[in-house]
């Protein structure tokens, strides 16, 4: 992801290093297959596509937790509301904020902010529906859209530590301290209705 050259013509982009998480990796694979085999326009009157997507890799999750001193949450018993409040009031890394500012300039639709965790890579333990997804409306004000987007990203990060997520991770014999979260930002597809 290059803040100087990114445009809405880019169908799938990655911000940062580290894992894409299971969901994003699957979407990237499907996108490459659609392009490679020209399936997106192969059938008359049918358009197959993956919504324009940007993935925030796990590097930024690690940075966010470390720079805001949030690791203590792993060993504490806070309510979901307390965790969400702590995360939303924390600051995302500058480089990520700048990349998202560049991205938001190209957005003209509502957005889905989706989880894509490292544990979603598991072949034997499904994690579908465990973490949060947030929908944000399109607002014709870049600053307001950016604020909504930043809050949604932090909220997805917080969902790693919610009670239901913790319980599921423990039941799957995984460790909460080893979980890492990537975030998928996707345009919402559809037709506006009156």
Specify the residue positions occupied by each region the protein language model found.
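Short N-terminal secondary-structure initiator segments
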Residues: 1-15, 67-84
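An N-terminal structural lobe/cap that precedes and organizes the functional/catalytic core
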Residues: 40-50, 54
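Metal-assisted phosphate- and nucleotidyl-transfer catalytic regions
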Residues: 81-95
């Amino acid at each position: 992801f290059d803040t100087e050259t990114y445009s809405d013509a880019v169908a799938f982009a990655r911000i940062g290093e580290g894992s894409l998480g299971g969901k994003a990796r699957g979407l990237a694979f499907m996108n490459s297959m659609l392009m490679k085999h020209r399936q997106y326009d192969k059938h008359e009157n049918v358009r197959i596509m993956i919504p324009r997507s940007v993935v925030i890799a796990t590097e930024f999750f690690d940075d966010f937790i470390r720079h805001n001193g949030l690791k203590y949450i792993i060993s504490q018993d806070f309510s979901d509301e307390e965790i969400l409040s702590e995360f939303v009031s924390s600051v995302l890394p500058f480089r990520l904020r700048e990349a998202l500012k560049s991205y938001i300039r190209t957005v003209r639709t509502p957005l889905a902010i989706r989880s894509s965790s490292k544990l979603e890579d598991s072949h034997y333990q499904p994690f579908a529906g465990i973490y949060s997804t947030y929908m944000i409306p399109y607002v014709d004000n870049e600053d307001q859209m950016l604020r909504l987007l930043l809050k949604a990203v932090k909220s997805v990060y917080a969902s790693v530590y919610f009670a239901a997520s913790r319980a599921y991770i423990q039941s799957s014999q995984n460790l909460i301290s080893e979980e890492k979260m990537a975030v998928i930002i996707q345009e919402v597809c559809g037709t506006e209705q009156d």
